Amino acid sequence: MGKPLQVGVISLFPEMFSAVTDYGVTGRAIKEGLLTVSVWNPRDFTHDRHRTVDDRPYGGGPGMLMMVQPLVDAINAAKQSLGEDTPVIYLSPQGQKLDHSGVQHLSGNDRMILIAGRYEGIDERVIKQYVDAEWSIGDYVLSGGELPAMVLIDAVSRLIPGVLGHQDSAAEDSFASGLLDCPHYTRPETYNEQQVPPVLLSGDHEKIRRWRLQQSLGKTWLQRPELIHSLALTDEQETLLNEFIAQQSSGE
């Protein structure tokens, strides 16, 4: 077994991360020693009786900002635990958009500290002095960085060897090949007069492989055509995609 992925999280709502630590794939990874998740609450590093972590922004404007001192002290505490050279990531709408390539890049780390902001964000001086990278999960605004942090943890954890039940599961996920996943079916064979495609019941592994590849190509062409344009398709993929497009045009 390799070194576990060690994740430190800076958050005002540590309890939210029980969704990661107690359930599903990530919860199992923690139980098996493949992943650790520790949370530091900036409120624990305040020095006033109100445990103040936010204040009004200079220059005016709506909302509040997370203050420097509690946030920096929480980051330093996380670094003391995980290592001073642990990269610090801020989950932010201004960050680089997280995709499969980004997840693969992040999976090369065995430690990381994630800052889950709240209110209108965090003081820019924290970003400039302590943050190594900013990542976003999409072009929209959430109430805080906790959900994006959990998304990142879940996505990266899936690439840790041994986390998924089947060794090929991560390799066959959507986007691992640059394509969307093919359709999947389980029992019963017929439901509401809809039948499982006969090829999946044939037992012919080569035909099944080609069908799945063609369906994956076709779904990507229909739903995310920009992904197709960014790929250098093999001769087989070109042939299968052209067959799929012809079938669509003929209404099959």
Swiss-Prot record:
Its EC number is 2.1.1.228. It holds the Pfam family tRNA_m1G_MT. Keywords: Cytoplasm, Methyltransferase, S-adenosyl-L-methionine, Transferase, tRNA processing. Gene3D superfamilies: 3.40.1280.10, tRNA(m1g37)methyltransferase, domain 2 (1.10.1270.20). One of its GO terms (molecular function) is tRNA (guanine(37)-N1)-methyltransferase activity. Homodimer. Specifically methylates guanosine-37 in various tRNAs. This is tRNA (guanine-N(1)-)-methyltransferase.
